[in-house]
Amino acid sequence: MSDLVFIGDVHLEMEGPDLEAFLAFLDRLKGTASRVVLAGDLFNVWIGARDLERPHQARVIAKLEELRRHGLAVRYLEGNRDYRVGRAYVGTALDDAPAHGLVERFGGRSIFAIHGDLANSADRQYRTWRRFSRSAPVWGAFRALPPRSRLALVDRLEASMRASNARFKAAFPEEVVRRYAAGFLARGHDAVVLGHFHVERALDGRVFVLPEWKQSRRHLQVGGDGAMAFVDSPA
């Protein structure tokens, strides 16, 4: 059985070495993996509208489509920088893109995965923003704007929220993460995988926090026997 691979936040922003390295990594997965889960925030901002694709995004999206044609399942966890991605890309670049987590049953394990941006129940400002920015009325008004205005608006709104998010992630909130993951483990899952925090952690062999890929060049690998380990990403 080929591996199941979880990839943490990548935050690709433009053409360059990081983009080329990531595309090469995805290409290598065709020979080693059967399933890929992207844990959200693949780009600095990803909007579910094909007419807003920037060149670097188009190249990654084309590579994901290629992986699916090769027979790999590609699943996506919408993160705090993703806006209705599933509506535009499920069926082409992605198999699915659930907003509230997904379950992978692999190697005899039930693995629950979710981006993790809602782990901090005390961050009410962010929770309010998340609901507002993804609501149907806001999305409808946003779609009515010309593409350039839409991109400029998203960039400004994201910049205004970075301070709150940065404060929360300045130090890894281990107890918050443990409590958050415990709720999913209590449902009968064997392991929980989170992105969002940009650090690599394996807590008690059951809770795995994915490193930010662009800096670490590492990912979480699940073998056919259910063994879970962080490994260097081949290029």
Please report, for each region that a protein language model flagged, where it lies by residue.
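Short, low-complexity, intrinsically disordered N-terminal peptides in bacterial proteins
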Residues: M1-D3, R167, A171, P234-A235
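Core catalytic region of metal-dependent phosphoesterases/phosphodiesterases
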Residues: S2-I7, L12-F106
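Short, charged N-terminal helix-start/capping segments
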Residues: M1-P17, A113-T128
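N-terminal short leaders/motifs
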Residues: N44-L67, P146-S149, A159-R187
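Glycine-rich loops and low-complexity Gly/Arg-rich segments
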Residues: L29-A33, V60-L64, H100-V103, A136-G140, ...
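Active-site metal-binding loops of divalent metal-dependent hydrolases
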Residues: G8-H11, D41-L42, N80-R81, G116-D117, ...
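Active-site-proximal loop/helix segment associated with metal-binding centers of metalloenzymes
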Residues: G116-V176
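Conserved beta-sheet core of the metallophosphoesterase superfamily
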Residues: T92-H100, S110-F112, D117, S121-W129, ...
